[in-house]
A protein has these predicted regions:
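Terminal RNA-binding accessory module
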Residues: 1-75, 357, 364-365
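Rossmann-like S-adenosyl-L-methionine
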Residues: 2-10, 18, 219-472, 479-480
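Extended interfacial segments that mediate partner engagement and assembly in macromolecular machines
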Residues: 59-71, 77-186, 205, 221
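Flexible loop/N-cap segments at domain edges
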Residues: 199
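Short, charged amphipathic recognition helices of the HTH superfamily
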Residues: 471-484, 495-496, 510
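Phospho-regulated, low-complexity intrinsically disordered regions of nuclear gene-regulatory
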Residues: 476, 524-548
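DNA-recognition alpha helix
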Residues: 478-490, 500-506
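Short Lys/Arg-enriched helix C-cap and helix-to-coil transition segments
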Residues: 510-520
Length: 548
């Protein structure tokens, strides 16, 4: 059956895509429907067809999903920012966790990956500490501001974004009031004329400090001082008013030159018990509360004892590496953005951290240089951009032979691709935890602990079967079989690390497993009591420990 354009079909939505669309099937053909929720029964108009799939739009909701909710944002159907505002947050978290699992299994080729439950956010709104708001004009020529529609550069007017904090709304209101009176025109991407391009906003949630930056097609604005005065009057926590000059005929938001109109040219934030200086171009996670949870998890996976050398690649302003410095012997951070490296060094000095150094280099080049210098880090932290790591970088990191690699990813697909190459080079993914840094949007972060794997993933046991009176089949329970038994009978997920810990506690032999620590002093997650009980019972079931 080939669906036709404008055909109306009845469909039940059975899943969600990474983009937040619902997906169902009609006669074996997958139909993708934006704004649909898993469990919806819909009438859908077909908009575009192919041999094995089609795209449609909702004509009528025949029976809503229990997870469907009314969007609380008037712009959500047009704006390309929020992909999940039409479903409950619990359902959104399930969709994101499934997305991570699907990528790691399908692209990465991992069977039964040890994926822990996603770390959700306490607050799904008002969390963003950075915004880039395009300025344009409507059909009547009036100045407007908002966000781009999905997959386009058409501005959807939106004066109040639910994801942003109150000071950003205050800044936008004040800026538009000033701009409409000033007579300044909006930049036109087609003609490359007009002055006002973007309003760029940053906030340090830990201190409440706010930065407002006007991105202009030129060197400045007429009446800058009056704008700064209005912003100072209206914006809570304002510390910085800047002009960014961007004369390029491009859709890149920021130009290379910044000028301070009022205040300072940086913000100071508090995170993970430390202070961080943030410049306009510095990479800094956009969700303060969830970033702290993410970094705590990365530190836990690093298993530091106070002696290790940590190599922090793509370090930005040094947040991850500096958060680990108090538990490491030495930290080496690498970042390609010069201003971010300068901030990282300032941040180390600001916090009296003397065991950290920062290099301004490409990550792959820096890794090769460190190999040539004979550096052998114990732990490597990777926090690459969305495109993931280059193959040559992965090979260089593997050549360094660190005991652990902590990979922080913002894209499940490129993460899965990189995990596959790491596995080929002798590193296997152990603990995997998704973290929702971007509630209501399609994005999700993931933290992975990799360590050198044993070529044979089965438990290594050398037992006399006759003496123990068990069958050959009973003696060959793999870690995955133990995990499956516990999940089926106790509804608990356990890691290979926890199984190894319980086996050792029971006096059983444990082979060289990739989840085991390299030394007795290495700090690793400890098995919770309820999981220890379940593992013990599973080992009894497989006759690997005597019944008592």
């Amino acid at each position: 059956m080939l669906l036709k354009k404008n055909e109306i079909v009845e469909i039940e939505i059975t899943g969600m895509t990474a983009e937040g669309s619902g997906v169902g099937r009609v006669e074996g053909i997958a139909v993708f429907v934006p704004g649909a929720a898993a469990g919806d029964r819909l009438k859908v108009r077909i908009l575009k067809t192919a041999k094995t799939y089609a795209f449609g739009k909702i004509e009528e909701i025949l029976e809503p999903s229990p997870e469907r909710i009314e969007s609380d944002c008037p712009c959500s159907e047009q704006c390309g920012g929020c992909a999940f505002r039409h479903i409950t947050y619990a359902e959104e978290l399930r969709a994101k966790e499934n997305r991570v699992r699907d990528a790691i299994e399908r692209i990465g080729g991992l069977q039964n990956p040890d994926i822990h439950p996603i770390v959700g956010a306490e607050h799904a709104d008002g969390y963003r500490n950075k915004a880039q708001i395009p300025i344009g004009q409507d059909k009547q020529g009036n100045l407007i501001a908002g966000f781009y529609a999905n997959h386009s550069h058409r501005i959807v007017q939106c004066d109040c974004c639910a994801l942003q904090p109150k000071p950003f709304e205050q800044a936008l209101d004040a800026f538009l009031e000033w701009a409409r009176k000033s007579g300044e025109s909006a930049y036109d991407e087609t003609t490359h004329k007009g002055k006002l391009r973007h309003l760029y906003l940053r906030m340090a949630e830990g201190t409440g400090e706010v930065m407002v930056c006007m991105v202009v097609n030129g060197n400045g604005l007429k009446g800058e001082d009056s704008l700064a005065a209005l912003l100072r009057e209206r914006v809570d926590g304002l510390k910085s008013v800047l002009i960014n000059s961007n004369r390029e005929d491009t859709n890149v938001v920021l130009g290379r030159r910044f000028r301070t109109v009022w205040g300072q040219d940086f913000l100071t934030d508090r995170m993970c018990g430390l202070q961080f200086r943030i410049s306009p171009l510095s990479f800094y996670q956009v969700n303060h509360a969830q970033a702290q949870r993410l970094y705590a998890l990365a530190g836990e996976y690093a298993g530091l004892t106070g002696k290790e050398t940590v190599l922090d690649l793509y370090c930005g302003t040094g947040t991850i590496g500096l958060s680990m410095a108090g538990r490491a012997g030495r930290v080496i951070g690498v970042e390609a953005v010069a201003q971010a490296v300068e901030n990282a060094r300032e941040n180390a000095a600001l916090n009296n951290i003397e065991n950290a150094e920062f290099l301004c280099m490409d990550a792959a080049e820096a890794a090769q240089l460190l190999v040539q210098r004979g550096e052998h880090p114990d732990v490597v932290v990777l926090d690459p951009p969305r495109k993931g790591c280059a193959p040559e970088l992965i090979r260089t990191v593997a050549d360094m032979a660190p005991s652990r690699i902590v990979y922080v990813s913002c894209d499940p697909a490129t993460l899965a691709r990189d995990l596959k190459l790491f596995r080929e080079l002798g590193y296997a993914a152990g603990l995997i935890t998704p973290v929702d840094l971007f509630p209501r949007t399609k994005h999700v972060e993931t933290v992975v602990c990799l360590s050198r794997k044993n070529p044979d993933d089965r438990i290594e046991i050398d037992l006399d079967l006759d003496e123990l009176d068990i069958t050959s089949a009973e003696s060959k329970a793999t870690y995955e079989e133990i995990k499956d038994y516990i999940l089926k009978n106790y509804n608990l997920k356990v890691s290979s690390l926890y199984i190894s810990q319980v086996k050792r506690k029971l006096g059983l032999e444990v082979g060289t497993n990739y989840n085991l620590p390299k030394s007795e002093n290495t700090q690793v997650p400890q098995c919770p009591p309820e999981k220890e009980t379940a593992i013990t019972e599973a080992l009894k079931h497989f006759s690997m420990v005597p019944f008592k």
